Amino acid sequence: MATETTTHNHKLSNKEVEETLRSVIQILIDGQEGFEKISEHLTDESLRRYFAAESLNRAQFRGDIEEVLHQEGVHDVKESGTVAGGIHRTWGDIKAHLGGGDHSLLETAEAGEDAAKKAYQEALKKELPLPIKQLLTSQYAHVQESHDYVKAARDARK
């Protein structure tokens, strides 16, 4: 395993790449758990299905990134959500919003999606190896679409 990855004359160490990917994995775990928990409490059936599917998408995104880390020789890739406060930091206190109906739950989900967008934006600012950058770019496009869907659903329920 090489100790450095060179891109555009800027060297990003494998450790920096690993840390960048771990931060995205952490936010994906939060999203996976957040979408799942909220899906259990939404009253709108189409939203329930969307949120359940989105939880699975985040699990798949996480698996794709973990596979990249394994290919780079990192074998301990199990993460448990964001270090800075877990799901409550990025998805709010879901339990506090359960009594607020779908609109309140959708606000919570949108805040979580804002955090996910920010994590991807931060990662994509870095000079990552091209295959990793392509993977994150593709995932980020999906996260943006999901954010917009959640926001539109929230706005429709004002």
Give the label of every model feature segment.
Residues E18, I25, I29, A52-S55, ...:
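Generic structural concept
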Residues L105, A109-K158:
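Preference for long, well-ordered alpha-helical segments
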Residues E33-E40, G63-H70, V74, G92, ...:
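Charged/polar positions within long, soluble alpha-helices
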Residues E16-V24, E45-G63, D102-L106, P131-V143:
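Alpha-helical scaffold segments that form or flank carboxylate-/histidine-based iron centers
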Residues A2-Q26, S80, I87, A152-A156:
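N-terminal/domain-start segments enriched in small and hydrophobic, helix-friendly residues
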Residues E4, D64-K117:
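Carboxylate-rich helix-loop segments that flank metal/cofactor sites and access channels
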Residues L47-V83, V150-A153:
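Conserved alpha-helical segments that form or flank metal/cofactor-binding pockets of metalloenzymes
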Residues N9-T43, H103-E127:
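Alpha-helical bundle segments that constitute or directly flank the non-heme di-iron/ferroxidase center
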